[in-house]
């Protein structure tokens, strides 16, 4: 079964890594389906039933986004609030439709990895900063598989650095 990659980037056309990752996934259409939230909902009016039906079709789901302001783009929070509803995602006999689905995060972080340490400039690890995602996935009984992060694009946006991100990203998706 294919993996659904939900891309949440407000300006993917001007992105560096996320745009490259999407291009790579397009090469493997037999393994991955890409769903871009900002392209699907430019006015940010989410079709909740369509999103729920989409999620129900997959056993493996990855949310891909740039990490800025120490979180995800706002449309992802809105998506969680509107799509992961009581009675569907949790809390009743018919709930937990996401239960047991393998879920992961694919994150691009402009800042270097060593800055996301207790001794770095931001004092917290990326694992600590993404804890709300893990808690959400645990609450809806999904099988959270952690995250893949690629750091440092702000300091190094060379073609070599970008291409270096692709094999481990695809390997992360394959291993989900």
Please place each PLM-identified region on the residue numbering:
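Glycine-rich, highly charged phosphate/nucleotide-binding loops
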Residues: 42-58, 165-168
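Residue-level detector of anion-binding/catalytic polar loops
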Residues: 31, 61, 143
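Generic recognition of short, well-ordered alpha-helical segments
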Residues: 16-20, 46, 74-78, 160
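N-terminal beta1-alpha1 ligand-phosphate binding loop
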Residues: 1-32, 165, 169-170
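Structural beta-sheet core signal
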Residues: 5, 34, 63, 103-107, ...
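Glycine-rich phosphate/pyrophosphate-binding loop and the adjoining helix
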Residues: 22, 26, 130-176
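Helix-loop-strand module that forms the ligand-binding subsite of alpha/beta enzymes
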Residues: 49-134
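A short beta-strand-loop structural module common to alpha/beta enzyme folds
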Residues: 31-44
């Amino acid at each position: 079964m294919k993996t659904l990659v939900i891309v949440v980037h407000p300006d993917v056309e001007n992105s560096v890594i996320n745009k490259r990752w999407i291009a790579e996934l397009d090469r493997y259409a037999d393994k991955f389906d890409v769903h871009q939230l900002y392209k699907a909902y430019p006015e940010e009016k989410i079709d909740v039933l369509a999103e729920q039906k989409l999620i129900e079709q997959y056993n493996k789901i990855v949310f891909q986004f740039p990490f800025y302001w120490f979180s995800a783009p706002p449309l992802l929070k809105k998506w969680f609030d509107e799509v992961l509803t009581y009675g569907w995602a949790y809390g009743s006999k018919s709930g937990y439709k996401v239960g047991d689905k393998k879920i992961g995060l694919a994150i691009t972080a402009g800042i270097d990895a060593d800055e996301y340490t207790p001794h770095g400039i931001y004092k917290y690890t990326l694992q600590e900063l993404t804890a709300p995602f893990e808690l959400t996935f645990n609450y809806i009984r999904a099988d959270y598989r952690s995250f893949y992060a690629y750091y440092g694009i702000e300091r190094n946006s060379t073609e070599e650095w970008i291409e270096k991100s692709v094999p481990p990203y695809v390997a992360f998706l394959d291993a989900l």
